[in-house]
A protein has these predicted regions:
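A short, Trp-centered hydrophobic/proline-enriched beta-strand micro-motif
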Residues: 18-26
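A structural signal for short hydrophobic beta-strand segments in well-ordered beta-sheet cores
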Residues: 40-43
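A short core secondary-structure module
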Residues: 49, 53-97
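N-terminal glycine-rich flavin-associated loop
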Residues: 1-6, 32, 46
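A generic, well-ordered mixed alpha/beta core segment in the N-terminal half of proteins
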Residues: 3-16
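Residue-level signal for inorganic ion chemistry
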Residues: 4, 54, 87, 114, ...
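Glycine-rich beta->alpha junctions and the first turn(s) of the following alpha-helix
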Residues: 96-194
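Short Gly/Pro-enriched turn/cap motifs at secondary-structure boundaries
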Residues: 30-33, 58-61, 77-78, 101-109
Length: 201
């Protein structure tokens, strides 16, 4: 949405083909996911680029990504919505330190530190200092996608469980014929339908 034609031509074909992966680095240790609470700074340099200093928390799949879209403060104070910019930062630049770890759901995330990391001026996505509304929309879309994924997983688990109870026998009868099992399956089905209803609304 913010990329110019040059950035789209450089990155979109590689992203579509799967040859390149991006991740979004926006959360910080002190922010507790308040999107406007940004301490990571990007200062313009004399050559038209930016020098990035700061840290990002819980960056999903940072270690396996080729580049990061990083929210940085280019002006204003810590809690101001105005003054936040997005920079497209290749992962292999000097000064980037990635501390990767496994999350509770088996994914990978990382703490990422930027120490005087220099990017060119064309790393800026959109207008300088005007990225907050885009970050907000991206987060909302991401949350919706995760909810859809979780609802789909619930559907698979419910159907697999129902199928298993029909195949598995106990006391010479399928488990699905036992009332206590039927009650549990109904509970699973109702919880799945409630989640699907919330998602579609």
């Amino acid at each position: 949405e913010l990329a110019n034609e040059e950035q789209k031509n450089d990155w979109l074909p590689k992203l579509i083909s799967g040859d390149c992966q991006l991740t979004f680095a926006y959360a910080e240790e002190q922010s507790r996911f308040d999107l406007e609470d940004v301490l990571t700074r990007a200062k313009p340099d004399e050559k038209g680029g930016f020098i990035i200093d700061g840290a990002k928390s819980m960056v999903l799949h940072a270690a396996s990504a080729d580049a990061m879209i990083v929210s940085c403060r280019t002006s204003g104070g810590q809690y101001e919505k105005k003054g936040i910019s997005l920079l497209l930062v290749p992962k292999d630049l000097e000064g980037i330190n990635i501390d990767s770890f496994e999350t509770v759901d088996g994914q990978r995330a990382a703490e990422v530190r930027f120490e005087s990391v220099r990017v060119e001026g064309n790393a800026l996505l959109g207008r300088e200092g005007d990225a907050f509304s885009t970050i907000e929309r991206a987060q909302q879309s991401g949350i919706l996608a995760l909810c859809a994924e979780a609802t789909g997983i619930m559907e698979c688990l419910y159907k697999d469980t129902a199928s298993y109870t029909q195949d598995r026998e106990q006391f010479d009868r399928p488990m699905s014929e036992f009332q206590v099992i039927q009650h549990r399956l109904v509970d699973m089905f109702m919880e799945y339908e409630q989640c699907k209803s919330m998602l579609l609304r």
